[in-house]
């Protein structure tokens, strides 16, 4: 008996709905980099990238254009200045870190539209994208690898 088929297979309609739902919750480094290069995170753009780690870790290296907003500080009061017209992309260190999940959860619970960056800063770096350092957001320049998918 097939191990792959031992649990059954979803119908094409069920599979389509499942995978569409996954894409509604997550994005990957290549798609985020493309949006950053296209100006989607600039003033007037449609997304805001949030580094959910501590300010010290943000200063050591972060995605260019990201703002530092530790998940532990997110509350109705601290999010008052956030626009409800934006989509917030949360990230943390990556595998083994749930800061991005906690940040995304808190923002969603407060009524914001949000996505989580798959693999966090680890996969961002692994894909060859540059990081900014210090307390300023910085700007992404050309670089990284093209997604092979």
Segments (PLM) and residue ranges:
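Flexible, polar/low-complexity N-terminal or interdomain linker segments that lie immediately upstream
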Residues: 1-48, 55-60, 134-149
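Terminal peptide-recognition signature
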Residues: 32, 51, 66, 107
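Short amphipathic alpha-helix with an adjacent loop that forms part of the alpha/beta core around
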Residues: 36-39, 75-84
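Short active-site oxyanion
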Residues: 43-49, 64-65, 87, 113
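Short loop/helix-cap segments at secondary-structure boundaries that form the rim of catalytic
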Residues: 58-64, 79, 124
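Short hydrophobic/aromatic-enriched beta-strand-loop microsegments
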Residues: 66-73, 111-117
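Short, hinge-like loop/turn segments at secondary-structure boundaries
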Residues: 67, 84-85, 131-135
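Catalytic cysteine-centered active loop of the rhodanese-like fold, especially the PTP/DSP P-loop
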Residues: 79-125
């Amino acid at each position: 008996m097939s191990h792959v088929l031992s649990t059954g297979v979803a119908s094409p309609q069920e599979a389509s709905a499942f995978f569409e739902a996954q894409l509604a919750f997550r994005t990957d480094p290549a798609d985020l980099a493309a949006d950053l290069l296209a100006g989607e995170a600039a003033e007037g753009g449609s997304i805001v990238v949030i580094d959910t780690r501590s300010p010290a870790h943000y200063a050591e290296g972060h995605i260019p254009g990201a703002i530092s907003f530790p998940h532990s500080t997110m509350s109705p009061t601290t999010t008052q200045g956030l626009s409800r017209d934006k989509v917030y992309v949360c990230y943390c260190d990556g595998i083994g870190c749930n800061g991005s999940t906690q940040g995304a959860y808190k923002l969603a619970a407060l009524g914001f539209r949000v996505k989580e960056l798959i693999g966090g800063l680890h996969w961002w770096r692994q894909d060859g994208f540059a990081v900014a350092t210090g307390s300023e957001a910085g700007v992404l320049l050309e670089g990284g690898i093209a997604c092979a998918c």
